[in-house]
C-alpha cells in the first residue's frame, strides 16, 4: 500500500526528471535549427558541384580519365565510413545505422573490409565483432565546421591514394527535414557520379589549364561532400534525440498525472478515515456523557 510520503517523493522525482528531459529536448531543438540552417544552405552548393563533376567527367580528354580520384580500379579492399552518435538518448538512430551496415556487409569477406568509425556506437559494434577499424573518431561531430571536414577528408583520401582502400562507401542519415531522416549508403570514392552513362564529344576550353583546375576542383568537391554528410548526420542525430526526449517528456507527464491522481485519492481516503475516527470519537463521548 503506497504512503503519502512515498507518493510525494515519486511526484517530486518525476518533476525533476521532466525538467531535465524538457531541457534536453529544448537544447536539441536549438542545435537542430543551427545544423539544419547550415545543411540546407550547403546542399545547393553540393548539388551544383556534383553537376559540375558529372559534366566535367563526360568531357574530360582521355589522358585525364586515369586521374587516381576518378579512375575505377580492381577492388581488393573496401572502405566503409560509418556515422553514429557518441551519446545515447536518440531513439533508434544508432540501431538503424548498424542494421543497415549489417545488411550492406552481409556476404562480404571481413578481411576485405576496412572501417572508419565516427562515434562511440560504431566503434563499439565494430570492435565487438572484431572488424578492422582503420581509424576511430570519437566526439568528432561536436565540431561540424569545414575545417573538421577537411581533416576527415585528408585521412580518407590519403588511404585511397596509397591503396589502403580501393573504394569507399559511407553509411549515414540524410537530413531531409525535422521529421524525416533516411539512412543512405553512398559510394564516394572513386569520384564517379552515378548519373554519368556516356561521354560527350564536345570541345571545351579549360583556362588556365585542365591540370591546374582538376586537382583543386576534385578536392573541393570531396571535402564539401564530406562536410554535407557531417552536417546531415549531426542534424539527424539531434532530430532523433529531440523526438525521443519529447516522447519521454510526454510519458513523464502522464506518469506525473497518474501519481497526482493516486496521491489525491490516498489523501481523500486518509481524510475520510480521520473524519470517521473523529465522528466515532464524538459519538463515543456523547454515549459516555449520557
UniProtKB/Swiss-Prot annotation:
Parts of the chain that traverse the membrane: none
Gene Ontology, cellular component aspect: plasma membrane; proton-transporting ATP synthase complex
Membrane-protein topology: Peripheral membrane protein
Main subcellular location: membrane
Location relative to the cell: Cell inner membrane
GO MF, one annotated term: ATP binding
Keyword NAD recorded: no
Gene Ontology biological process: proton motive force-driven ATP synthesis; proton motive force-driven plasma membrane ATP synthesis
SUPFAM superfamilies in UniProt: ATP synthase (F1-ATPase), gamma subunit
HAMAP family attached to this UniProt entry: ATP_synth_gamma_bact
The family this protein is said to belong to: Belongs to the ATPase gamma chain family.
Function: Produces ATP from ADP in the presence of a proton gradient across the membrane. The gamma chain is believed to be important in regulating ATPase activity and the flow of protons through the CF(0) complex.
Subunit structure: F-type ATPases have 2 components, CF(1) - the catalytic core - and CF(0) - the membrane proton channel. CF(1) has five subunits: alpha(3), beta(3), gamma(1), delta(1), epsilon(1). CF(0) has three main subunits: a, b and c.
The name this protein goes by in its record: ATP synthase gamma chain
Lineage: Bacteria, Pseudomonadati, Dictyoglomota, Dictyoglomia, Dictyoglomales
Gene giving rise to this polypeptide: atpG
Amino acid at each position: 500500500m503506497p504512503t503519502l510520503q512515498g507518493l510525494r517523493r515519486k511526484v517530486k522525482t518525476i518533476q525533476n526528471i521532466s525538467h531535465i528531459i524538457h531541457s534536453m529536448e529544448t537544447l536539441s531543438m536549438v542545435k537542430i535549427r543551427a545544423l539544419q540552417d547550415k545543411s540546407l544552405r550547403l546542399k545547393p552548393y553540393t548539388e551544383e558541384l556534383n553537376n559540375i563533376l558529372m559534366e566535367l567527367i563526360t568531357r574530360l580528354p582521355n589522358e585525364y580519365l586515369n586521374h587516381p580520384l576518378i579512375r575505377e580500379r580492381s577492388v581488393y579492399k573496401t572502405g566503409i565510413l560509418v556515422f553514429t552518435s557518441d551519446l545515447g538518448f536518440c531513439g533508434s538512430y544508432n540501431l538503424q545505422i548498424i542494421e543497415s551496415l549489417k545488411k550492406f556487409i552481409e556476404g562480404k569477406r571481413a578481411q576485405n573490409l576496412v572501417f572508419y568509425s565516427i562515434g562511440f556506437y560504431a566503434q563499439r559494434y565494430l570492435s565487438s565483432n572484431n572488424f578492422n577499424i582503420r581509424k576511430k573518431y570519437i566526439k568528432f561531430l561536436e565540431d561540424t565546421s569545414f575545417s573538421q571536414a577537411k581533416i576527415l577528408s585528408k585521412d580518407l583520401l590519403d588511404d585511397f591514394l596509397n591503396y589502403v582502400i580501393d573504394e569507399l562507401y559511407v553509411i549515414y542519415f540524410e537530413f531531409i527535414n525535422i521529421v524525416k531522416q533516411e539512412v543512405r549508403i553512398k559510394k564516394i570514392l572513386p569520384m564517379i557520379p552515378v548519373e554519368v552513362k556516356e561521354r560527350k564529344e564536345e570541345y571545351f576550353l579549360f583556362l588556365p589549364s585542365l591540370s591546374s583546375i582538376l586537382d583543386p576542383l576534385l578536392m573541393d568537391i570531396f571535402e564539401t561532400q564530406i562536410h554535407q554528410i557531417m552536417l546531415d548526420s549531426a542534424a539527424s542525430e539531434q532530430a532523433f534525440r529531440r523526438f525521443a526526449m519529447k516522447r519521454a517528456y510526454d510519458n513523464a507527464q502522464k506518469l506525473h498525472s497518474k501519481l497526482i491522481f493516486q496521491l489525491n485519492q490516498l489523501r481523500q481516503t486518509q481524510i475520510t478515515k480521520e473524519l470517521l475516527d473523529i465522528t466515532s470519537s464524538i459519538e463515543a463521548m456523547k454515549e459516555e456523557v449520557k
